[in-house]
């Protein structure tokens, strides 16, 4: 009887240990997924590019040769590429930048977000029609057309602009000026007065119905914009960006 009782106790202890190990493994897997996200997505974010600079918006009611309201612009680009190691056939339905918010406002100026504009020479123009408050969506298409908010369904580039406006007035009688971050320095602005932090969700939706989302925070502008005029940064080590299904 005593041996039978010991065997039962031993069996229960072994079962309890097995159950505990099972839940520990499940918990560890969930924690790892929460931190690292998906590891074999059909399309991968391969690069984030940031360009910080500045320009002037003309003040029309003036006799000065140059009279500008200064704006500091930060253009952020996300490059998605097809994962050649993913064996299933997939295509992009849309890529969106959602839940856009300013976590830290600059000490000076007014902040806005902009989507690409058909009226812009390049991608962006700081006009009211192109302002976004919550999200910008790029629809999947056979080819990319950024100004039409279209991205190739096999991968492409999407972007958004974060602008700090109403930073001051630049007045000059010089023959020629260059529109860049040096204008900000010329009116006495300091980097710490521009320091900001933004956050958003980057969402990838496939035509199969699968959706992935990654939360991203970014400090802006880039540190050297006041000294170099135009500051650029490319981020390819993206382990901190964790896409998860939702």
Each predicted region: which residue ranges?
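Charged, low-complexity, helix-prone segments enriched in Lys/Glu/Asp/Gln
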Residues: 9, 194-196
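N-terminal Sec-pathway targeting helices
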Residues: 2-21
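Hydrophobic alpha-helical membrane-insertion segments, chiefly the h-region
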Residues: 20-31
